[in-house]
């Protein structure tokens, strides 16, 4: 999971869900009474192996509604010393968190492309730097994966043992 978040560029600030065929799996949302399989009951790898699918959807930040279609490429034997999974291609840069979903991102790009836009200075203050949607920042992915791996180890150690059971 942390490798996927890092590759996509998200900060892991929101709930997420995977959709493999008609089955959904992900982080439990206490406000949602859906049929999602809780993330602690199976793994994405197990779901993919059980269904045999070659692509799946990754839904992130239910409020903004980001939907990613992820295709599984060539599956080969592991090579000693290589880190897996590997990102083989990326199209475009990840939008900033909490930008308002696809419509908000489109507006953000419009504003950031025009330094004369009345909201340019405000967007620059919020984002903190110029934004190039074509700069995928591939050089940052290994560092992001390392960061998320360390962060998740710490956060999982602090999780409560309490489990929510549907009745």
Walk through the language-model features, giving the residues of each.
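Short linear regulatory motifs enriched in tryptophan with gly/pro/ser
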Residues: 1-167
């Amino acid at each position: 999971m942390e490798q996927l978040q890092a590759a996509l560029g998200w900060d892991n600030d929101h709930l997420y869900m995977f959709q493999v065929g008609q089955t959904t799996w992900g982080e439990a949302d206490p406000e949602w009474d859906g049929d999602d399989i809780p993330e602690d009951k199976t793994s994405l790898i197990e779901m993919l192996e059980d269904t045999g699918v070659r692509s799946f959807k990754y839904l992130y930040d239910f409020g903004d509604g980001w939907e990613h279609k992820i295709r599984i490429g060539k599956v080969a034997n592991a090579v000693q010393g290589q880190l897996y999974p590997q990102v083989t291609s990326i199209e475009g840069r990840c939008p900033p968190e909490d930008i308002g979903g696809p419509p908000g991102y489109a507006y953000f790009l419009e504003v950031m492309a025009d330094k004369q836009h009345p909201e340019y200075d405000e967007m620059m203050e919020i984002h903190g730097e110029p934004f190039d949607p074509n700069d995928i920042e591939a050089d940052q992915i290994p560092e992001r994966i390392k960061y998320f791996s360390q962060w998740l180890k710490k956060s999982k150690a602090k999780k409560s043992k309490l489990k929510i059971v549907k009745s």
